[in-house]
Design a protein with these regions (language model features):
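Short, charged, low-complexity patches
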Residues: 78, 135-139, 143
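Short helix/loop capping segments that flank catalytic or ligand/cofactor-binding pockets
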Residues: 33, 53, 137-138, 205
């Protein structure tokens, strides 16, 4: 028996979910069974209770549920997120090649099934933006895994900077702000970005 609260949706919501749309809007939810807190995982089901997907819930948002999986066998532990990160990074390295891999978008939100998360890489600096509460609550684990995987791939990462200075976070019930992520990686502000610009300028000559 699954442990997640059930969110029953309208026929419109069902069609959207079956079509691969990753969002369930508030007006598409008709009934809720079970207890939950904002940021928790919940199951999305049809009016007859048939499983459609699992995602992060947030009552503060117009996007009530952000779906992360449509597989009932998935266990959403650290190993799950590590596999998903590895897949996204391996894909970019394969498609873009080593040279472009050092300056690109590593994680692109719903496209990589990390709803509301963007991660850009500029040489040895990562810049992130988190726009969903479910990811926000798990970002410590995700960022540490991301850095670990990149280092295992032979990529040097010295800093991770959070650019969360966007108003949409307020609509999601989160605070705005920008700062270095709390690890021992953080360089002096400005030092890395200056180096990035110089390196990219040299590459273009």
């Amino acid at each position: 028996m699954r442990k997640y609260a059930k969110f029953f949706v309208t026929p419109k919501g069902e069609r959207a979910a079956r079509g691969g749309h990753p969002w369930v809007f508030g007006e598409e939810v008709t009934k809720i069974e079970g207890e939950y807190a904002n940021g928790d995982l919940v199951d999305v089901v049809t009016s007859k209770g048939k499983y459609l997907g699992t995602g992060f819930v947030n009552d503060h948002s117009k996007i009530r549920v952000r779906i992360i999986s449509t597989n009932t066998n998935d266990k959403f532990d650290e190993a799950f997120w590590e596999r998903r990160l590895r897949y996204a990074l391996d894909y970019r390295l394969t498609v873009m090649g080593e040279r472009d891999f050092n300056c690109c978008r590593l994680i692109f939100g719903e496209a990589d099934m990390f709803p509301g998360l963007t991660v850009d890489r500029y040489n040895d600096l990562l810049v992130t933006q988190t726009l969903s509460l479910g990811i926000e609550m798990r970002k410590q684990m995700l960022f540490e895994l991301l850095i670990k995987i990149l280092r295992e791939m032979g990529q040097e990462i010295r800093g991770l900077y959070e650019r969360n200075d966007v108003r949409i976070r307020l609509l999601e019930g989160m605070e705005e702000g920008k700062h270095w992520f709390a690890t021992d990686l953080c360089p002096e502000p400005g030092a890395v970005t200056t180096e990035i610009v110089e390196n990219r300028s040299e590459e273009r000559r």
